[in-house]
């Protein structure tokens, strides 16, 4: 059996549930039912719902074989785990921030000052790398208020959009750490349970598919070479003969290709200009290596 720890609530919960569903491993239950354990469609893969901050230690200690959580939390806990895959969502930055009216303009201005944070280890390492001595004050919440009540001169805190800083009259003066959600594994489990890599491959196939689109079109046989020059494809386009019920009609080929999603606008217009018609653009659910 493989046990996967995923966030039980918060901004990482729903994207994680959706990713597993798209990968063919839908999870029963979730935050709404307040359950601790759940099953997937694979009888050998079970789910453990946990606080995102606790998942690195759960995986390190073997309570879970695999986990999904933010790289900021993994780094802060110093967890001895194997990072398998950047899942590309849950983007956030740990920023160094000071009051809007503060005279501090950079980290170096904080020499000998107090910095409050929920991420003391990352914060200490950041200032150590800069050769700056500060007093790090660990708080468990409401970090934004500490400069306004005299507890600290600055804070290091998570900022996804900057709105919370703005509301609390704070300004960011540096980025301390950039984070996304990662798939991690217990090192011993990774060696002993081959299915962990199957899980990684399934999730990765969904991430790869989101960046691609499937193109289908009809192409006059005389225009095939021009169309091939437009289509990059993953391993060249697929070309098939289109059967016509009328022998007098122009001969057509069906051309299929996988292309980068962000190139669709440009490619479709080029294809039309070289004679392609009946062009279909289709989302892809998964791309398996």
Curated annotation (Swiss-Prot):
It is found in: Cytoplasm. Pathway: Amino-acid biosynthesis; L-histidine biosynthesis; L-histidine from 5-phospho-alpha-D-ribose 1-diphosphate: step 1/9. Transmembrane segments: none annotated. Keywords: Amino-acid biosynthesis, ATP-binding, Cytoplasm, Glycosyltransferase, Histidine biosynthesis, Magnesium, Metal-binding, Nucleotide-binding, Transferase. One of its GO terms (cellular component) is cytoplasm. It catalyses: 1-(5-phospho-beta-D-ribosyl)-ATP + diphosphate = 5-phospho-alpha-D-ribose 1-diphosphate + ATP. One of its GO terms (molecular function) is ATP binding. Its EC number is 2.4.2.17. Its cofactor is Mg(2+). It is an enzyme of class 2 (transferase). Pfam families: HisG, HisG_C. Feedback inhibited by histidine. It comes from the Archaea. Its main location: cytoplasm. The keyword Transmembrane does not apply. GO terms for biological process: L-histidine biosynthetic process. Catalyzes the condensation of ATP and 5-phosphoribose 1-diphosphate to form N'-(5'-phosphoribosyl)-ATP (PR-ATP). Has a crucial role in the pathway because the rate of histidine biosynthesis seems to be controlled primarily by regulation of HisG enzymatic activity. HAMAP family: HisG_Long (MF_00079). Belongs to the ATP phosphoribosyltransferase family. Long subfamily. This is ATP phosphoribosyltransferase. It comes from Methanosarcina acetivorans (strain ATCC 35395 / DSM 2834 / JCM 12185 / C2A).
């Amino acid at each position: 059996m493989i046990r996967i720890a995923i966030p039980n609530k918060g901004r990482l919960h729903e994207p994680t549930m959706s990713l597993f569903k798209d990968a063919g491993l839908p999870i029963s239950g979730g935050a709404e039912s307040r359950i601790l354990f759940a099953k997937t469609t694979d009888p050998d893969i079970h789910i453990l719902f946990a606080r995102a901050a606790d998942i690195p230690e759960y995986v390190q200690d073997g309570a879970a074989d695999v986990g999904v959580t933010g790289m900021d939390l993994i780094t802060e806990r110093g967890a001895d785990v194997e990072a398998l895959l950047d899942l590309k969502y849950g983007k956030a930055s740990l920023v160094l921030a000071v009051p809007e009216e503060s005279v501090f303009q950079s980290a170096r201005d904080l020499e000998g000052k107090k910095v409050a944070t929920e991420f003391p280890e990352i914060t200490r390492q950041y200032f150590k790398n800069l050769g700056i001595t500060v007093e790090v004050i660990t708080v468990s919440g409401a970090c934004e208020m500490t400069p306004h009540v005299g507890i600290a001169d600055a804070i290091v805190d998570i900022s996804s959009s900057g709105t919370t800083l703005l509301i609390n009259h704070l300004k960011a003066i540096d980025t301390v750490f950039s984070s996304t959600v990662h798939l991690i594994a217990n090192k011993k489990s990774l060696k002993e349970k081959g299915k962990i890599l199957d899980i990684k491959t399934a999730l990765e196939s969904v991430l790869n598919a989101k960046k691609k689109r499937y193109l289908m079109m009809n192409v006059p046989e005389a225009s095939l070479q021009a169309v091939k020059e437009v289509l990059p494809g993953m391993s060249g386009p697929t070309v098939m003969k289109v059967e016509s019920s009328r022998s007098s009609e122009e001969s057509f080929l069906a051309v299929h290709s996988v292309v980068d999603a962000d190139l669709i606008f440009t490619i479709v217009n080029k294809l039309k200009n070289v004679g392609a018609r009946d062009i279909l653009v289709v989302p892809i659910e998964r791309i398996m290596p």
